[in-house]
Amino acid sequence: MTDLKIIMRIARTDLAILFYSPIAWFILNVFSFLTTASFTSLMENIVTDYDLSGGKEVSLSGICFLGSYGFLSSVVSNIYIYIPLLTMGLISRETASGSIKLAYSSPVTSGQIVLGKYLAAIGFGCCLMLVPIASAIYGSLVIPSFDWAPVLVALLGLYLLICAYCAIGLFMSSLTTYQVVAAVGTLIILAILNFVGSIGQEYDFIRELTYWLSINGRTIDMLNGVIRSEDVIYFVVVVTLFLTFTTFKLASDRRTISRFRQAISYLGFFVAAMAIGYFTSRPGMIKVWDTTRTKLNSLTENSQHVLAKLTGPVTITNYVNLLDNKSYRYLPIMKKANETIFEPYCLAKPDLQVKYVYYYDFAPNGVANNPKFQGKTVDEMRDYMTMIYNLNPHLFKSPAEIRQIIDLREEQNTFVRIMETQDGKRTFIRDFEDMDATPSEAEITAAIKKMISTPPTVAFIKGDGEREVSKSGDRDYSNFSIEKYSRAALINQGFDVCEIDISHGDTISSLINIVVLAEMRTPLTEKGENQLEAYLARGGNLFILTDTGRQEVMNPFLSKLGIKMEEYQLAQSSADFSPNLILAKATRESGKLTFGFKDDFPKYDLRVSMPGCVALTCSNNDYGFQYTPILETNAKGVWIEKEQTDLQESPVECNASAGEKEQTYITAYALSRQLKDKEQRIIISGDADCISNTELTLSREGYRSGNFNLIIESFRWLSGGEFPIDIRRPHCTDNKLSIGVKDIGTMKTIFIIIIPATLLLIGVGIWFFRRRN
């Protein structure tokens, strides 16, 4: 008899014993009932939400089955309960009864015994998989264009986890004659493997070893439809390791082996497994396959194209100030968790390295503001913080030492990353003061693109009463332009920003790509006007923002563009807001400019709040421009108020006898024309407050603000689509359901009653047949 036949014979025998065991059927029935109940509860919520909302642009395959809130995640979270009960008697039962000695006396090797019993265990694991597979099949029937590939990967991850648990349980079953002890021992080993990943996280080498050894989170990527080579290798190594342990244990029972030799053998197997795991988990060795239809877990095509142009080694250095309020996120113990931020980039570019530099220095917004540290020196604060975090004080560079490397006082000594190429090009990648905090793909790719190309420079004109970016006043523009810790700020989206005073000596150089002229209060000097006209003549792009009361100053220049500001400001009737607040919407024509105007504004019914706004009209078309209205008012309830000038407090009404008329008014235009080899682009807004510091931070009920969207899409169009980075993905095709709320009862009957009842009847039938024979 060949080895394979012996193994299969042992597997069939043990599998039959399992199926004749009431414990196995109890496990199968409890598992099926709880699993189907979880699935139907999730599906009920999804179906109800779908019926109420009318559908959303989301992957229903993913919502139902993938991710941390999907159905398969709940199965993975609970499967550890069942496997120890399944494997506890595979060897311990025979050891306790003495029947194992018959196997020892037969011409069967220990390896054949172990493999046979292991195949029986994972064979029963296949039976456990039937319920999740049935749920996936049902999902494919009710979700048209079901995304099968990632769901199959998630099912594979679940089965690999079952296989690993079975190998561990089989080993524990070989160590004792008591089945309960074997089950408890298996749970203890699983607990250790879950906990070990948090040990030694402050030490680089130990962190890599313990993180790899940890089984916690090993299926997370697969549950998202991603196959990682290190995860597959992990399961193969763990299964092989514990099967080897079990084989050696049975072999040592058959013949006398000294305890020293046993210890050396176990240690050798363990070290070999750790070595394999360590080297196969190095960034250059890891291969990743994203099986989702939209490649949701991978870099977008735009990011991949940008990264492909980045040649040579690249270093991202994290500068962590112990005395900064954000330091706890980036201490050594958090290194592994923070790797996920740049992991897609490191996998795509193996010579991209992430380093950490730890230091301590005074941070204006740091722990020094705590009353506990009043009057203390930075050294005293360092000593206290290192004591709190249980860190070595010598890990942190002193203020003098860090300033020899880099002076971060302009960054307020807060946490910051610097990306640097081999030839010395560098750029900042910051954290932000919002819910997500860490940079997204858009900000990281923008930083990379700034190093491989010349970023567009946005120059804000000042000196004639214009809004300024260097000031943080209510009417100024620092928030969206140079605010370092604002995600949407131009400097964090790939632009360079500067201010120029063209009326008093500054020039508009050829390096400037976009000029912003925001509400002049006094006319430009002759020199300034000549410069602006020369910039306009050579095809420079402009963003012009006007405001009420500035017609006399700005209309002369706007007339050269074929645009005119109406004499009086707009009013909008509202029960909630003052009449001077105009809530403009994107026009249908604006969709020709950018995808944001086309998709986001109508999809979310975004409104641009424009307090104190004037209507714009095309005065003539003698300059070769194509005029595209991008913002407009409602057709009703909006008019040009000609009688009153103070619209903030006084109630106003549309007076037809005064020439006031309710109709749609244009509040922003986009102008474009072809000049030689380039297209000139200009945006003109009838309000300058709409992108001011105050307006961007105000929150009003009753509408969804699109002011930041206006900024992003305007500069996207003005920069020719170069920045901000487009990280859109293909639309989901599995976003429809073919069942409704009325079908929930049928679904529950099938999954909660019919499937568990069928399994129960089969189990009872086998038990009855077995007992009768």
At which residue positions do the language-model features occur?
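Long, hydrophobic alpha-helical segments
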Residues: Y69-R93, L128
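Juxtamembrane extramembrane loops of integral membrane proteins
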Residues: R282-G424, F428-A447, P455, I461-T507, ...
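Hydrophobic alpha-helical transmembrane segments of polytopic membrane proteins
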Residues: L152-Y178, L241-L243
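Hydrophobic alpha-helical transmembrane segments of multi-pass membrane transport/permease proteins
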Residues: P22-T48, S74-I83, I189-I192
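Selective transmembrane-helix segments that form parts of the transport pathway or gating/packing helices
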Residues: P22, I83, T109-Y138, C163
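Acidic, S/T/G-rich, low-cysteine, solvent-exposed domains in lumenal/extracellular/periplasmic regions
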Residues: Y477-F723
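Extracellular ligand-binding/catalytic regions of CAZymes and related secreted enzymes
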Residues: T256-G284, D290-K309, T315, E441-T457, ...
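Terminal transmembrane helical anchor/hairpin motif
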Residues: L42-L66, L175, A182-R255, I630, ...
